[in-house]
Amino acid sequence: MKKLIAILLLLTLMLCAVSCKKDDTTPSGMKDAATADAEYHLYVPEMWVPNNGNGISGAYANSTDKANVTVTSYLPDTVMSAESYFNDVCLPQYENGTLSGFQVLNDLCGDTMLGGLNAKKYVYIYSLAGVDYETMQVIASTGKMVYNLTYTATAASYADYTEDVEEIVKAFAFR
């Protein structure tokens, strides 16, 4: 009788453990830094610090360096591809704005994926307030909505986080 009770208790515990398992798709070693109402998951390494100000999903690598990743969504007035978003919306602002020495690094640009969507990757350098920066934008479009994942770091520390950022881009997923 004691064996039967022990077996039933064990089966009950196992059933509870299996039924209570949450369906968490967070990749190992990462956490979700997306805002609660975002249409996507922005998975970043555990050691990165989420920074979700003004409804923009983001995280930075550490409090010293401030290398960061952000994701913004853009609803254009007309259907827009990733390439047209960069060329028609972003590029004019960068070239005519406050970024001095702006230069696209064409050999680092190309096709990629973001959350299962075809995307374009753009890498460029510039100076702002006397500091040299390097930025990578990964842009995907559903036609109606444009998603823009941006990684920015000082030129001196950019390479320190590119492996993390490649994992962030790879893990990005729509809800």
Regions found by a protein language model. Give the residues of each.
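Conserved polar/disulfide-associated segments of primarily extracytoplasmic proteins
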Residues: 54-141, 146-147
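N-terminal targeting sequences that direct proteins away from the cytosol to non-cytosolic compartments
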Residues: 5-11, 15-66, 108-114, 128-132, ...
